[in-house]
């Protein structure tokens, strides 16, 4: 299929289909979606959720307290927003059931760059997927059911066509009322069309924004007289009116009001009757115009607070259904957001060194969290991400304790994802010769940006503390392990020798026997054996050597029976592997011959160095990054 035929097919599927009123009513009998409300159609577009039993995943079970959670595939790209999306879907579900929510404005409240606009755009795109039925030619896309009177016609429509009476709450528009007079009351002359909502053509989807307080009026919402038609029609004639307002265009669909509370209050008045009564007045002496759609608004907290604190706005506030859209507070989900943004940019295939996105996500999340009492904020961040800190930080509290003490506004302040992505852009372009990102450049760019942003002194100090107290030290540890792991593979034989010698000495020490070295003939008594064992144990801080030695020897004896009497590899027992690594890297000088980029003393050293670079590249670094990060690590270790 060519692109042209593909486009043509897509266009054909959304073309109008025309019916007589009788055919439409017969269709209602067979298909409930023919008279579905906007909320019902949006629920259809969202689809059924996937139920996730968090008890089967230790991380999720800690985050969601072992509950079964709902995840909607339609919102798969919105990471870490399960609670917010659940509330939005609940609003549509209740509105679809005809409850109070159908008379309320869905209001997304959150900080800048938190995802409000993205959610609004997603809802508008979802709305485009499900068609609706309207009277042909109606400038406000009104439902054919608006032609009927619930009190007079409701019983007949329910008995003959199965249409519940609650769907007959709409009124006829002034345009339809004029046509009815022209048809002499013969409603069968009305034609019905099947339409797909369209953002592009403003069919059942509209967007309005606040304008200048001095010149914006309600015509942006309700339309106005078309001056060009006044030659043909009187000013109060339905055909002289331009139904161009957002409420007119969004009937039976969704109207988005961007930064709603920045608009003058007089502009918002039509929304009161549109939500509560399902209709609103025009700017002229016409009859009321129907509105059976969804009102979606969003703005930042500052506008909401000033609006709420004004007593004159109480009637309006009562008609608002608030859904908070805070910043993401889980590091793993914040990383997914960055990955999504990178995928949609030309940096999708650029090199990003391991831990770069994680470090930026940690910094962003730390800026959004409230500092806990009697516990550090870094531990709180890890608990929020579902980590178990029982063994590593005994002062860490449970996730629920942290949430309770933080209050309901956590996540409504801090650095936005937008800010973080701008930082990431600078990091990728930091090196003039290579489009790539790494944590060392990230630390530098973050520090520079914090100085330039002119944050309040307290906030600035707090952000710098995050870098120096939490992120930099942990990255030194991380890159150290990366380098050591790549280095270690050059010295696997050395590691095995230490392992074998440790097991041998520990075995003789436990049995309280002297050990004679078969090569040198040197005899080691129990005290000498203990000294040799401690040389390996002390760098790792082993607090109970006796138990540790017994544990290791028992493990090796069991392993030998399954390995033809040979010792297992030194990597096979985690506890001893860590001890040996600490022993091997207790002196930075041991690393220098392999990881430094100075001239090598021998071909053997050069080969090991080349092997080290190859292994680092395999781990996700560019050759240039290997050099930069290795030299940075050696400098830092030396200064410590």
Q: What are the residue ranges of the model-derived segments?
A:
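Conserved ASCE/P-loop NTPase catalytic core
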Residues: 33-640
